[in-house]
């Protein structure tokens, strides 16, 4: 299971803010949805299902994009594997 740091804030326009570091980032609509789903506590499989419901895309491509995005968030120390 992947856990987003509780302190992470997401604006409606797609800005992510980490108040512990003061860092902020801009994400696209897909990234914004992923952050939203992580905040809800959804699993990777649930996130993929929701993304496929929202965006008409190949499930394998969506999985790769999710994996890449989660790896990036991990490098930024915004998520942790539980």
Where are the language model's segments positioned?
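Long, charge-rich, low-complexity alpha-helical segments
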Residues: 26-82
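Acidic, low-complexity/disordered tracts enriched in E/D and polar residues
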Residues: 1-32, 36-39, 82
């Amino acid at each position: 299971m992947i856990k987003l740091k509780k302190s992470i804030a997401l604006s409606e326009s797609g800005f992510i803010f980490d108040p512990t570091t003061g860092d902020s980032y801009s994400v696209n609509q897909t990234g914004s949805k992923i952050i939203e789903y992580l905040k809800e506590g959804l699993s990777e499989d649930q996130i993929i299902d929701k993304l496929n419901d929202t965006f008409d895309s190949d499930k394998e491509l969506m999985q790769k994009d999710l994996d890449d995005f989660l790896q990036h968030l991990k490098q930024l120390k915004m998520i942790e594997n539980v």
